[in-house]
């Protein structure tokens, strides 16, 4: 056991000498890289800016693109203001939330763990009035059959 104790202090001495050498190398390295550091600073600042942009940018789900596409299908010559687009987007979010709540209630009433197309269809009939519900159901079934066939 005594030789093991001797090896440890012997290993520690070279280890303590190595950081001194590394410090001197570390001091020399930045001095040599000063001109390059000037070139790297914009890249690093840009990288830091990208990180900030990524942190600020949150994926907000909006329907603005789809609202605009439908508007151009119905009235190609008419535009829409950003305020009106925001109102339409919040309207669609509200309708979808009401449909989801109604569908979840229906699933709970029937003691089912999943919301199927049947619950969504019934929720549409309950939430939307009269003729609008009929059109929504027909368009929904058309979309579901198109999705399942492809």
From Swiss-Prot:
<feature type="modified residue" description="N6-acetyllysine; partial">
    <location>
        <position position="7"/>
    </location>
</feature>
<dbReference type="Pfam" id="PF00125">
    <property type="entry name" value="Histone"/>
</dbReference>
<feature type="modified residue" description="N6-methyllysine; partial">
    <location>
        <position position="4"/>
    </location>
</feature>
<dbReference type="GO" id="GO:0046982">
    <property type="term" value="F:protein heterodimerization activity"/>
</dbReference>
<keyword id="KW-0488">Methylation</keyword>
<dbReference type="GO" id="GO:0000786">
    <property type="term" value="C:nucleosome"/>
</dbReference>
<feature type="modified residue" description="N,N,N-trimethylalanine; alternate">
    <location>
        <position position="2"/>
    </location>
</feature>
<comment type="subunit">
    <text>The nucleosome is a histone octamer containing two molecules each of H2A, H2B, H3 and H4 assembled in one H3-H4 heterotetramer and two H2A-H2B heterodimers. The octamer wraps approximately 147 bp of DNA.</text>
</comment>
<dbReference type="InterPro" id="IPR055333">
    <property type="entry name" value="HISTONE_H2B_site"/>
</dbReference>
<protein>
    <recommendedName>
        <fullName>Histone H2B.11</fullName>
    </recommendedName>
</protein>
<dbReference type="GO" id="GO:0030527">
    <property type="term" value="F:structural constituent of chromatin"/>
</dbReference>
<dbReference type="GO" id="GO:0009536">
    <property type="term" value="C:plastid"/>
</dbReference>
<feature type="cross-link" description="Glycyl lysine isopeptide (Lys-Gly) (interchain with G-Cter in ubiquitin)">
    <location>
        <position position="146"/>
    </location>
</feature>
<feature type="region of interest" description="Disordered">
    <location>
        <begin position="1"/>
        <end position="57"/>
    </location>
</feature>
<dbReference type="GO" id="GO:0009534">
    <property type="term" value="C:chloroplast thylakoid"/>
</dbReference>
<feature type="modified residue" description="N6-acetyllysine">
    <location>
        <position position="33"/>
    </location>
</feature>
<keyword id="KW-0007">Acetylation</keyword>
<keyword id="KW-0238">DNA-binding</keyword>
<dbReference type="InterPro" id="IPR000558">
    <property type="entry name" value="Histone_H2B"/>
</dbReference>
<dbReference type="GO" id="GO:0009570">
    <property type="term" value="C:chloroplast stroma"/>
</dbReference>
<keyword id="KW-0539">Nucleus</keyword>
<dbReference type="InterPro" id="IPR007125">
    <property type="entry name" value="Histone_H2A/H2B/H3"/>
</dbReference>
<dbReference type="InterPro" id="IPR009072">
    <property type="entry name" value="Histone-fold"/>
</dbReference>
<comment type="function">
    <text>Core component of nucleosome. Nucleosomes wrap and compact DNA into chromatin, limiting DNA accessibility to the cellular machineries which require DNA as a template. Histones thereby play a central role in transcription regulation, DNA repair, DNA replication and chromosomal stability. DNA accessibility is regulated via a complex set of post-translational modifications of histones, also called histone code, and nucleosome remodeling.</text>
</comment>
<feature type="modified residue" description="N6,N6-dimethyllysine">
    <location>
        <position position="13"/>
    </location>
</feature>
<feature type="modified residue" description="N6-acetyllysine">
    <location>
        <position position="39"/>
    </location>
</feature>
<feature type="modified residue" description="N6-acetyllysine; partial">
    <location>
        <position position="40"/>
    </location>
</feature>
<feature type="compositionally biased region" description="Basic and acidic residues">
    <location>
        <begin position="1"/>
        <end position="35"/>
    </location>
</feature>
<feature type="modified residue" description="N6-acetyllysine">
    <location>
        <position position="12"/>
    </location>
</feature>
<keyword id="KW-1017">Isopeptide bond</keyword>
<dbReference type="GO" id="GO:0005730">
    <property type="term" value="C:nucleolus"/>
</dbReference>
<keyword id="KW-0832">Ubl conjugation</keyword>
<feature type="modified residue" description="N-methylalanine; alternate">
    <location>
        <position position="2"/>
    </location>
</feature>
<feature type="modified residue" description="N6-acetyllysine">
    <location>
        <position position="28"/>
    </location>
</feature>
<keyword id="KW-0544">Nucleosome core</keyword>
<comment type="similarity">
    <text>Belongs to the histone H2B family.</text>
</comment>
<feature type="modified residue" description="N,N-dimethylalanine; alternate">
    <location>
        <position position="2"/>
    </location>
</feature>
<dbReference type="GO" id="GO:0003677">
    <property type="term" value="F:DNA binding"/>
</dbReference>
<keyword id="KW-0158">Chromosome</keyword>
């Amino acid at each position: 056991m005594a030789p093991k104790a001797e090896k440890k202090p012997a290993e520690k001495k070279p280890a303590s000498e190595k950081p001194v050498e590394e410090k001197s190398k570390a001091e020399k390295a930045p001095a040599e890289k000063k001109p390059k550091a000037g070139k790297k600073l914009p890249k690093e600042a840009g990288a830091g800016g990208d990180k900030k942009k990524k942190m600020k940018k949150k994926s907000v789900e909006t329907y603005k693109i789809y609202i605009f596409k439908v508007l151009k299908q119905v009235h190609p010559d008419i535009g829409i203001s950003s305020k009106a687009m925001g109102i339409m987007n919040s309207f669609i979010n509200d309708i979808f939330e009401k449909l989801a709540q109604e569908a979840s209630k229906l699933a709970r009433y029937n003691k089912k763990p999943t919301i199927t197309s049947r619950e969504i269809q019934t929720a549409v009939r309950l939430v939307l009035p009269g003729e609008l519900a009929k059109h929504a159901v027909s368009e929904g079934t058309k979309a579901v059959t198109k999705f399942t066939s492809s």
